[in-house]
């Protein structure tokens, strides 16, 4: 059975930095071996949902994860860079907009900085333990998990929300309204922002939302609303609210 009208949110697989040691942010680092395995597990979990269109951030770890997932469906992503789309209207990019002209195994993949991880400012790329020693573990945790404020010279979750959600409304919602199965591969912060918007989570409760690398959340688009499907939460999306 082919499933249609779904939104799949996937956090990228583990990056090459030691897990939990550094705050990656905008550091553009590829997947580790474990990250590749996590992406393969996502591909297996999604084998019954045929992806029609996909979105990723500008950072390579999300794109690697996404293409591994697509390869599990024997599909090839045709990348539409945001700058290309700005210069040439989508309706002129026939083979981007309608990849079935080149075969059903090709689907458009839109990459955008709107889905990037938060910029960590003075914490960017620094060892988490060192930052906790300098600022205090509680303060670092507040910067990372509260809706606002963000770290020194960096983005708060609110700032990420304000760039991620408008993009989602403009680019992703039309595809869902058209009955497409949409895959978004992004980061802890940008996905938390989307989950906050979709599930109408309060500024206070969003602190408890966590997504581990390689985890996913699936929503069904019905009657103009996105309804969560994998409510068991378990390994898919860890929430404690």
Curated annotation (Swiss-Prot):
Family matches, as PANTHER family: PHOSPHOGLYCERATE MUTASE
Keyword Calcium set for record: no
Binding site for substrate: 24-25, 61, 117-120, 128
Pathway listed: Carbohydrate degradation; glycolysis; pyruvate from D-glyceraldehyde 3-phosphate: step 3/5
Family listed: Belongs to the phosphoglycerate mutase family. BPG-dependent PGAM subfamily.
Name this protein carries in UniProt: 2,3-bisphosphoglycerate-dependent phosphoglycerate mutase
Coiled coil: none
Catalysed reaction equations from the record: (2R)-2-phosphoglycerate = (2R)-3-phosphoglycerate
UniProt GO BP: gluconeogenesis; glycolytic process
Molecular function via GO: phosphoglycerate mutase activity
Xref: Pfam families: His_Phos_1
Domain of life: Archaea
Job description of the protein: Catalyzes the interconversion of 2-phosphoglycerate and 3-phosphoglycerate.
EC nos: 5.4.2.11
Transition state stabilizer, annotated site positions: 187
Entry keywords, A to Z: Gluconeogenesis, Glycolysis, Isomerase
Catalytic center residues: 12, 117
Native source species: Methanosarcina mazei (strain ATCC BAA-159 / DSM 3647 / Goe1 / Go1 / JCM 11833 / OCM 88) (Methanosarcina frisia)
CDD domains per record: HP_PGM_like
């Amino acid at each position: 059975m082919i499933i249609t009208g779904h939104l799949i949110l996937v956090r990228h697989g583990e990056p090459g930095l030691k897990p939990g040691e550094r705050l990656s942010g905008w550091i553009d680092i590829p997947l580790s071996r474990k990250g590749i395995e996590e992406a393969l597990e996502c591909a297996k979990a999604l084998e019954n949902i045929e992806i029609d269109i996909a979105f990723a951030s500008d950072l390579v770890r999300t794109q690697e994860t996404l293409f591994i997932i697509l390869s599990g469906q024997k599909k090839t992503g045709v990348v539409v860079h945001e700058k290309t789309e700005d210069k040439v209207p989508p309706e002129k990019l026939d083979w981007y907009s309608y990849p079935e002209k080149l075969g059903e195994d090709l689907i458009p993949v839109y990459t955008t900085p709107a889905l990037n991880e938060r910029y960590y400012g003075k914490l960017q790329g620094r060892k988490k333990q060192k930052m906790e020693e300098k600022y205090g573990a509680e303060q670092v945790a507040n910067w990372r998990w509260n809706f606002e404020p963000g770290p020194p010279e960096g983005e708060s979750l609110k700032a990420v929300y304000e760039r991620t959600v408008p993009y989602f409304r403009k680019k992703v919602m039309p595809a869902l309204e058209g009955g497409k199965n949409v895959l978004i591969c992004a980061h802890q912060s940008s996905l938390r922002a989307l989950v906050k918007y979709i599930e109408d989570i309060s500024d206070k409760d969003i602190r408890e939302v966590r997504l581990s690398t390689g985890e996913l959340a699936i929503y069904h688009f019905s009657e103009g609303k996105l309804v969560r499907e994998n409510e068991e939460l378990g390994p898919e999306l860890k929430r404690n609210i």
